[in-house]
Amino acid sequence: MTCSVIPTLTEAASPVAMAAAPDHRRSVPRRFLRPPKPWNPTVGLFLCGYLLAGLTIWGWFVGGWPLPLLVATGFLALHLQGTVIHDACHRAAHPHRFWNAFMGHGAAMLLGFSYPVFTRVHLEHHAHVNDPEKDPDHTVSTFGPLWLIAPRFFYHEYFFFRRRLWRRYELLEWGIARGLFVVIVVTAAQQGFLPFVFNCWFAPALLVGVTLGLFFDYLPHRPFNERNRWRNARIYPGKTMNWLIMGQNYHLVHHLWPSIPWFHYKPAYEAVKPLLDVKGSPQRLGIYESCDDLLNFLYDVFLGIRSHRRSRSRLRNLVRIVPSRWACRQLLHVLHRTAVTPLPRRS
């Protein structure tokens, strides 16, 4: 069996299967679309995240905790806030608009993000999934190796200003958030606790960036060529994974109905699974199903730069340093085969 590193297409349901399958439901039940209660699991994540951040600070300055434990508590604090800011930008963190925004800004501060940037850029992602020009997360996922995905989130800031996405006072909010970040770092340098900032904030933030990039951006949307709303993200069901990554293994449910809070993804999926089956929605991880899938994943782990034109890869200039013609041909073959060609939106 021969294997090639090519983006695999999701198999859509055949017309015969779609006609034969019972379609008793056209959308998710309304109960999942209602605003969350004032005290809900997302509020718990927000409070637990700040509690863990406080324990990390205490453990460094007072408790003398070992560094691995401090990195772990810092990582968990930021990991929880990743879900908080994500739900807040969809107004699904709290029913009251003020507290929803408060939680979003609070989560962003711990993560080193800007809440207006995250919100506007993420909504652009939802509007243009897998569009090479308009989806900012598409660039994050396809312009480098997975192990370097965290630094590519800075592209969101560039995208925010290039597209002039801010509204009303959001530019002021960005300035305050970034000013506060600079003040913290400068104060840390002057007062001698910069090692704490690097070890217990920046290092966990880097780890969380890889986690968010993998489970929020890369895995849900690979192989990055589907733009149909029923197939532009995937689901890989699992109870344990559901809690570890707080529902992002049901990412397609989130894209279809963004107002559903993370703790309802799983029951919402179970309610609409027959509909998703009819629509041909991908419901597997899609990495180990074939040799092509595995090779694509390994390519993305170590290199991950994908062109959108098979004859003009972003890595084509590497051919100049390859010593032999045979090696040049093999490299060009790989670069051409790894190109991503997104399908039309209604395909």
Which positions does each model-derived feature cover?
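Long, highly hydrophobic alpha-helical transmembrane signal-anchor segments
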Residues: F61-A107
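Membrane-helix boundary/juxtamembrane motif in polytopic membrane proteins
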Residues: L172, F198-F202, N225-I235
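Juxtamembrane helix-capping/reentrant segments at transmembrane boundaries
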Residues: A93-F113, D131-P145, R227-M241
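Transmembrane alpha-helical segments that form the membrane-embedded catalytic/substrate-channel core
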Residues: L76-I85, S114, F118, A203-R227
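Long helical/loop segments within the catalytic core of UDP-sugar-dependent glycosyltransferases
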Residues: L76, P237-Q248
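Histidine-centered catalytic micro-motifs
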Residues: Q81-R91, F118-N130, D217-P223, L244-I260
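Non-catalytic, topology-defining segments of multipass membrane proteins
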Residues: M1-A77, A108-A203, W262-S347
